């Protein structure tokens, strides 16, 4: 988790500044390396619809280390093990699809 990048991201949002990012569905971390080189604010690694395995996700996380780009992982479903594993790879956050309210989210 990159707290400096998260702080910069939140500051931009608080100041109503636009944030730019990329939705990643490909296995190659070269895509993420390009996003970092372009100075994008965020990437989302799509583990719901993409054909990514955990090795691919770790490769993308390595590409954002020590950058100002935050990395989020979108998992396939509300599942504590998937959330924990995503965070263990170094994700700055997790996107859980198909949640209408936070009433369905247990606290782990």
Language-model-detected regions and their locations in the chain:
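Expand to "…catalyze enediolate/carbanion chemistry for C-C bond making/breaking, isomerization
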Residues: 1-108
């Amino acid at each position: 988790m990159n707290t400096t990048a998260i702080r910069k991201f939140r500051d931009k949002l608080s100041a109503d500044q636009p944030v730019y990012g990329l939705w990643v569905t490909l296995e190659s971390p070269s895509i993420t390396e390009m996003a970092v080189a372009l100075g994008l604010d965020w990437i989302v690694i799509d583990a719901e619809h993409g054909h990514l395995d955990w090795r691919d996700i770790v490769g993308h996380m390595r590409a954002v280390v020590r950058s100002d780009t935050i990395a989020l992982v979108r998992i396939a479903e509300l599942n504590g093990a998937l959330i924990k594993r995503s965070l263990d790879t170094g994700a700055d956050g997790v996107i859980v699809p198909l949640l209408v309210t936070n009433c369905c989210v247990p606290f782990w």
